[in-house]
Curated annotation (Swiss-Prot):
HAMAP family the UniProt entry points to: Ribosomal_bS6
Stated role: Binds together with bS18 to 16S ribosomal RNA.
Name listed for the protein in its UniProt record: Small ribosomal subunit protein bS6
Origin species: Paraburkholderia phymatum (strain DSM 17167 / CIP 108236 / LMG 21445 / STM815)
MF terms in GO: small ribosomal subunit rRNA binding; structural constituent of ribosome
Stored CDD domains: bS6
Keywords, sorted A to Z: Ribonucleoprotein, Ribosomal protein, RNA-binding, rRNA-binding
Gene Ontology cellular-component terms listed: cytosolic small ribosomal subunit
Encoding gene, per UniProt annotation: rpsF
Chain spans, region Disordered: 97-124
Biased composition (Low complexity): 114-124
Amino acid sequence: MRHYEIVFIVHPDQSEQVPAMIERYKTTITSHGGQIHRIEDWGRRQLAYMIEKLAKAHYVCMNIECDQATLDELEHAFKFNDAVLRHLIVKMKKAETGPSPMMKEVQREEAKKAAAAQPTEAQA
C-alpha cells in the first residue's frame, strides 16, 4: 500500500459538518484495510484567492496509507460532495506522523490567543 497526504478545503458554512465528514472518510479508509497516520483540522483560514466568491474556508489534512481502489473511492467522494471546494492528493515516500508546519502555526496562534486572554481574566 502507498502513503498519501490529502488536503481538502470545505465551504465555511459547512464547518460544523467537518467532524462527520472526517469520520466518514476514516471509515472508508479503515474498512478497506487502510491506515490513518495523521489527521489535522487546521480550521477556518484565509484563502490565497477567491473560490466561488469565498475568502475563507475550512482546511483539513490527512496522512493515510491505502490501496488504489480506496483512493479512487475517496476522490469520488470529494468530487461529488458540494461542501468540498478543492482537494489535493499527494503521494508520499513514507508515513508522516509528526505535526505539519501548518499545524505548528495553528498551535502557535492558539497559544497567543490563550496568553492574551489570561491577563484579561486575571483583572476581572
